[in-house]
Amino acid sequence: MKTNILVKRMAVIGLAVAAACTGAAAAAQGAVPQAQRIIRVLSVAGGDAASPQAAVWKKAPTTQVTLLTAFPGHISIVGTAATQKLAAQAVRASGRLFVRLAWSDRTANTVMKDTDQFLDGAAVEFPVNGKVATLPFMGDPVNVVNVWHWRADGRTLNLLAKGFGTSTPVPTEDLRSASVRTGDGWEVVLSRPLRVKAEEGANLQGRRTMPIGFAAWDGENQERDGLKAVTMEWWQLRF
């Protein structure tokens, strides 16, 4: 009984936060029209898309995505995120989805040697049910999201979340990443098979569209956990 009450309360809180954040996003971003929130996926028969500097990325459409500071999920971790935009691309090849992200970051934060040091990072997010009605703010107790999280220390995490503070690592050997440090910042590719087991995340096989969200962390700016730059609304992968 207590568990059910807690779940309902979390859902209500999540909906309230979503309403507030969506309104703020619309005002701050000038409400990017839904028709413009499209990431077009380039489908190729083969080839190597795993590297951020692979030739295929010169052919894939590039979309500029605006980011905003995420709603503070924890009152002790607050601030203004540094990253304001990133360039997103996507390729479907050899039964995998490859997502390439590129953004400006003046300093490379790749290690944490002390408690006041934090890593650069980036992530993409999908609603497991494939529905835009899912909250883009880490989901809710009923609607789970799947996050692919790249960290600048070389780790790549496959996560499931049911709301703020609920991110849970889910073992998988199929999520991969590659990164390149450029003179301007980072270029990162995250990839995973289109089809995975239900308990491992979002199934992308056979879909014509899929909601997707983005996030970036600037370690130099003390960003970690919920302090990050994010998309406040779902964008759409269009296969």
Swiss-Prot record:
The protein's role, per its UniProt record: May transfer electrons to the iron-sulfur centers of ClrB.
A Gene Ontology term for the protein's cellular component: periplasmic space
Cofactor remark: Binds 1 heme b (iron(II)-protoporphyrin IX) group per subunit.
Principal place of residence: periplasm
Organism: Ideonella dechloratans
Protein name as annotated: Chlorate reductase subunit gamma
Primary gene name: clrC
The keyword Cell inner membrane appears for this protein: no
Pfam families: EB_dh
